[in-house]
Amino acid sequence: MSVIKMTDLDLAGKRVFIRADLNVPVKDGKVTSDARIRATIPTLKLALEKGAKVMVTSHLGRPTEGEFTPEDSLQPVVDYLKNAGFNVRLEQDYLNGVDVKDGEIVVLENVRINKGEKKNDPELGKKYAALCDVFVMDAFGTAHRAQASTYGVAEFAPIACAGPLLAAELDALGKALKEPARPMVAIVGGSKVSTKLEVLNSLSKIADQIIVGGGIANTFIAAAGHNVGKSLYEADLMPVAKELAANTDIPVPVDVRVGLEFSETAAATEKAVNEVKDDESIFDIGDKSAEQLAEIIKNAKTVLWNGPVGVFEFPHFRKGTEIISHAIANSDAFSIAGGGDTLAAIDLFGIADKISYISTGGGAFLEFVEGKVLPAVEILEKRAKN
C-alpha cells in the first residue's frame, strides 16, 4: 500500500493539519477514557519536534451540523492535553484561516459541527485544505467514511499523507491479510453470521483455518446436524454455513457450556455438543474444544482475532474466551486484534502487551478485513501517485 508517510516529510515551518480520532467519552466535562488521546499524543509530539505549526481536529459524538452545543465541544480534550503539558488552545472559528504560533497546538473545534462535513462537501474540503501545507490523516477509525475532513481535504491539500497511527495500522493489516505467514488462523466471534458474512467469505479465501465463536458458532453447530436448543442462531443461514464449512477448515466445537437463561447468575453445564436439550442455550465452548483450538493457535504463524467465543461478560461462560485469549497471548504468531468486544476481552484478561497489534478502528477494521477499499486511504494512495 503506497502512501506518503508523515514520518518521511520535512515539516519545518509548515502548517500541518492533523485529522485525529479524539472521539472520546466525556462526562461532566471530563474525559472518562483517554485511550484515543494517548494514541494520538506521539503524532502531536512528532509534528512539534519536526518544527511544524500544528493544528489537530476530530469529530466528537453525533452533533447536528450547523448547530453548536457545549456538549459537542472538544474543550475536554484541550483540557486533557493542557494537563499533559502541551501549549494548546481551542479555535472555534477557523474555516477562514487560523494563526498558529511556533510550539503551540491549535485544536480546531469538532468537525461534525461544520455544514457539509458528513456528505463530503468539496467547498468545505477546500476550506480545510487552505488552512495547511500538509494534511495528515491519522484517524483509522473513520477511514471507511468519505467525509470532508477525511477525504475532501486530502483531495485539495498541497500534500496529503498518513500519520504514524494510520501507517502502523495499514502495515499491520497488510502483514496479516496480504501475505500472511502460514498457517494463518482467523477467529471470528459475534452473535450473528449475517453481520460477519462478508468477513467470513473474505477470510475463507485467506485463512488456513477459521475458528468461529458465539452465536456464529451456533449456526455452524446446527448446520453440522446438532440440536442447539434455544440458542441464538440463524436457521436461514445454515446453507451458507454448510458451504463455508465444506470449502474451509472450520472446526465445530466438540463440547459446549449451556445455561437455561441468558443471565449472569445462570448455572453453566458442560456437555458434549450432541447432548444439548431443547430448553438449553449454548453460551460458551467447552474445555475440550477450547484446548483443541488453543493447540491450533499455538501452531499458527499469523492470528487475526475479531470477537469472543462465548458470553465472556458472564463469569460462568468466560472460560472459552479466556483459554483462547491466553493461547493468542502465548503464541509466537504475529497477532492482530480488532473490534469492541475483542478489546474488552483483551482488557479483562490483561494481555494487551502480548498482542502484536491492536486495531483502533471498529467498522474500518472490519471493512478492511472484508477486502473493501477504505475511501480515506484510497485518496492518500491517489495523491501519492501524483
Curated annotation (Swiss-Prot):
One of its GO terms (biological process) is gluconeogenesis. It comes from the Bacteria. Keywords: ATP-binding, Cytoplasm, Glycolysis, Kinase, Nucleotide-binding, Transferase. The keyword Transferase applies. It is an enzyme of class 2 (transferase). One of its GO terms (molecular function) is ADP binding. It catalyses: (2R)-3-phosphoglycerate + ATP = (2R)-3-phospho-glyceroyl phosphate + ADP. ATP binds at residues 196, 313, 339-342. Substrate binds at residues 21-23, 36, 59-62, 112, 145. Pathway: Carbohydrate degradation; glycolysis; pyruvate from D-glyceraldehyde 3-phosphate: step 2/5. Its main location: cytoplasm. One of its GO terms (cellular component) is cytosol. It is found in: Cytoplasm. Its EC number is 2.7.2.3. Monomer. Belongs to the phosphoglycerate kinase family. This is Phosphoglycerate kinase. It comes from Haemophilus influenzae (strain 86-028NP). The lineage of its organism: Bacteria, Pseudomonadati, Pseudomonadota, Gammaproteobacteria, Pasteurellales. The gene is pgk.
